């Protein structure tokens, strides 16, 4: 199957999956968070997309990824779509009008614009002992001259076990209380509304 056909399958199959979710229930959960909108949606992607992206990320050579070491964190990232075709197909699907409108309804944030430059986005990989220190995300995206409004993470972990660690913690504005600890189960999608002082990370290896 040529690239355009796969792209259309990703988009159509994700949109079909969206229709299986109870959007009103998701909205209630999202907006019931104590300080900011946050939700983890299990099995968000069709399984074949999870498998394709998981294999692509798993087999991506480390020398093709950027080493992320800011503020004591350690992880690897790649948003070069020329060498990750399945990531490219997925990004196109998640940038579609259908998905953006669904995301706007979920979050209540209107006039969302996907970032074509993938600033701070793309595949990310952590190895044993790697950490993501507790932090807040940057707000201003210079490349598009817009403020970040919504963040999304989709997990592609193969056979993740809970005792491996790596759950993503979300804290209160004083970094003292953990509101949510999100397990990185494969295929799950995490969404949150960007606001100042949304501290998150997995500081323990």
Q: Model-flagged regions — what are they?
A:
Residues 40, 113-116, 122, 191-192, ...:
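A structural signal for short, well-ordered beta-strand segments and their strand-loop junctions
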Residues 140-148, 158-205:
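Catalytic core of Fe(II)/2-oxoglutarate
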Residues 48-51, 77, 124-133, 140-142, ...:
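Short catalytic/ligand-binding loop motif for oxyanion handling, primarily in non-cytosolic enzymes
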Residues 61-63, 110-113, 158-162:
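Proline-centered turn/helix-capping motifs that create local helix->coil transitions or kinks
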Residues 151-153:
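Eukaryotic charged/polar low-complexity linker/IDR segments
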């Amino acid at each position: 199957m040529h690239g355009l056909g796969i792209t259309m399958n990703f988009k159509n199959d994700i949109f079909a999956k969206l229709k299986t979710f109870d959007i009103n229930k998701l909205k209630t959960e999202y907006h019931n968070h104590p300080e900011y909108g946050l939700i983890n949606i299990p099995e968000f992607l069709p399984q074949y997309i999870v498998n394709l992206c998981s294999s692509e990320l798993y087999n991506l050579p480390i020398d093709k990824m950027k080493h992320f070491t800011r503020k004591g964190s350690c992880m690897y990232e790649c948003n070069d779509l020329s060498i990750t075709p399945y990531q490219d197909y997925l990004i196109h699907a998640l940038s579609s009008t259908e998905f953006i409108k669904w995301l706007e309804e979920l979050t209540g944030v209107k006039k969302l614009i996907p970032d074509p430059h993938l600033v701070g986005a793309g595949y990310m990989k952590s190895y044993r002992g790697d950490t993501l220190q507790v932090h807040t995300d940057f707000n201003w995206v210079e490349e598009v001259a817009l403020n970040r409004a919504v963040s999304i993470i989709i997990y592609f972990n193969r056979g993740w076990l809970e005792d491996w660690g790596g759950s993503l913690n979300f804290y209160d504005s004083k970094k003292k209380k953990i509101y949510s600890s999100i397990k990185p189960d494969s295929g799950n999608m995490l969404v949150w509304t960007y606001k100042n002082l949304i501290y998150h990370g997995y500081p323990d290896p």
